[in-house]
Amino acid sequence: AASDVYKRQTYAGQLKLRPYQTLHFELGRAVVGQCGSLISKVLYVKQGTRKKFAILDAGMTDLIRPALYQAFHKMENITSEEPLEAYDVVGPICESSDVFGKAIDLNKVKRGDLIALRSAGAYGEIMASGYNCRELPKGYTSDELV
């Protein structure tokens, strides 16, 4: 609309860029974060005395945000339509902080299922590490919306 054009022109006029300058900006986590998911395979399901654990092949080396500052990533079992059950979702690294989430409701999990950790597009790949001799995660891109 005309008001949008006016706002852009006003903003551009206030920047006062010199002819040799260009403006670059980062989209940021609010946009980019939603554009990526970490897909991980379930290695084991372990029944503890009070809770169940879903142990994934991805760990804090692949997505460190939950271990580093308790960031929450929505999780879903993308291969099961069975009823929901609560799981502590953890990685295989021998560190007590290798935890993606506690008491996460997922469709019943079994070995080999695929778990999607959503909103991993920002900082996931760039913060990954080879700690504990682990390979870096593989990245795939698509222009399809799912």
Q: What spans do the regions from the language model cover?
A:
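Short, small-residue-biased leader/transition segments that mark boundaries at the very start
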Residues: 1-6
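Charged (often Lys/Glu-rich) extended helix/loop segments that serve as interaction or gating elements
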Residues: 21-146
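Alpha-helix-loop-beta-strand connector modules within alpha/beta enzyme cores
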Residues: 7-15
